[in-house]
Amino acid sequence: MAEVFVGPVAQGYASGEVTVLLASPRSFCAGVERAIETVKRVLDVAEGPVYVRKQIVHNTVVVAELRDRGAVFVEDLDEIPDPPPPGAVVVFSAHGVSPAVRAGADERGLQVVDATCPLVAKVHAEAARFAARGDTVVFIGHAGHEETEGTLGVAPRSTLLVQTPADVAALNLPEGTQLSYLTQTTLALDETADVIDALRARFPTLGQPPSEDICYATTNRQRALQSMVGECDVVLVIGSCNSSNSRRLVELAQRSGTPAYLIDGPDDIEPEWLSSVSTIGVTAGASAPPRLVGQVIDALRGYASITVVERSIATETVRFGLPKQVRAQ
C-alpha cells in the first residue's frame, strides 16, 4: 500500500500530487551489516584501541558513527604504532586486503579481525585457484578501489586489470595464453557484460568463475532501479561518493536518460533538481543506512504532497556469520 505524506507544496513542483517510487531492495546488504556489526562488537570487547584499515564500508555516516564510538580509521598499517598498544586490534574492511597486507599485520604482531565480505573472499579464492593452475587472470574492476587492490594482490604476477572493451582490445599476450576472468562485486551489470563479451570474442577458451562474481545485492539494487527508472523525472541515490555500487546506480539512471544525483542524506538535496517533477525515484546503495531513506522521504514531503510507492523486485534473506573472534559465545 502506498503511503501518503502531506506537506507544503514547493514552488516549481508540478501541480497535484508527486509520486515517490521507492526501489526495493535498497540500503544495507549482508556483507555491510556483517562488517559494521564486527566493528561494534570489537569495540565492545577490545582491551586496547581498535584500528580499522580503510573505511569499513564506503559511507561517511557509518564511518562517522563508528569513529564516535571509538574506532580509529587508518589508511595503512604503518599508521598504527609499532609495537602496537597493549590489547590493540585491527579490523580489515569489507572490501578485503591482499596477502601482502595480511603478512604485514602478522610481521608486526597485530591482532586481526577480518571483516572482508564473504563474496569478496570468494573472488580472492577464485583468483588464487586460477593462478595456481597457470591461467592469466583478467580482473574486471575499477582501478584504485580497495576491492580491486586486494584482488590484484592475490596473484600479482598473474593478474591483469581491465575496465572497458578498449582495455581488452589492448591486451598483448603471448600465443596460447589461457585466460580466466573475474569481476569486482559492485560493478554495473550491463557494462560488465560488454567487457565479458569482448573477452570471449577475443579469447574463445576464456575461463570463468563457477558462479557470478557481481554480488546479489548489487544485482538486486540495479534491477530494482531499472524496473522503475523509465517512469521517473529524477532519481535520488542515497550513498557516499566513494561507494562504487551507489555510483553505478546513478550511472544506470543517467544512461536511461533520467537525471540522477548521489546524496549522502537529505541535506544534499537541491530544490532545483525537483523543479516541475511529478515522479521522483529514490534508492540507496548497499552501504547506506536504511534510516537515511526515511530522512530523505521526510525532506521530500517538505516540498509537496507525496505518495510513496515501493517497487520491489526481490526479497533478500542472505545473512553472513560474524568472524569467529566476535561471535556470541
UniProtKB/Swiss-Prot annotation:
GO terms for biological process, alphabetical: dimethylallyl diphosphate biosynthetic process; isopentenyl diphosphate biosynthetic process, methylerythritol 4-phosphate pathway; terpenoid biosynthetic process
Residue numbers binding [4Fe-4S] cluster: C29, C117, C215
EC number: 1.17.7.4
Keywords noted in UniProt: 4Fe-4S, Iron, Iron-sulfur, Isoprene biosynthesis, Metal-binding, Oxidoreductase
Positions that bind isopentenyl diphosphate: H58, H95, H145, S243, S244, N245, S287
Binding, dimethylallyl diphosphate: H58, H95, H145, S243, S244, N245, S287
Active site: E147
Broad enzyme group: oxidoreductase
Pathway field: Isoprenoid biosynthesis; dimethylallyl diphosphate biosynthesis; dimethylallyl diphosphate from (2E)-4-hydroxy-3-methylbutenyl diphosphate: step 1/1; Isoprenoid biosynthesis; isopentenyl diphosphate biosynthesis via DXP pathway; isopentenyl diphosphate from 1-deoxy-D-xylulose 5-phosphate: step 6/6
GO molecular function: 4 iron, 4 sulfur cluster binding; 4-hydroxy-3-methylbut-2-enyl diphosphate reductase activity; metal ion binding
Residues the record lists as binding (2E)-4-hydroxy-3-methylbut-2-enyl diphosphate: H58, H95, H145, T185, S243, S244, N245, S287
Database matches in CDD domains: lytB_ispH (cd13944)
Cofactor-binding details, from the entry: Binds 1 [4Fe-4S] cluster per subunit.
Name of the protein in question: 4-hydroxy-3-methylbut-2-enyl diphosphate reductase 1
Gene that encodes the chain: ispH1
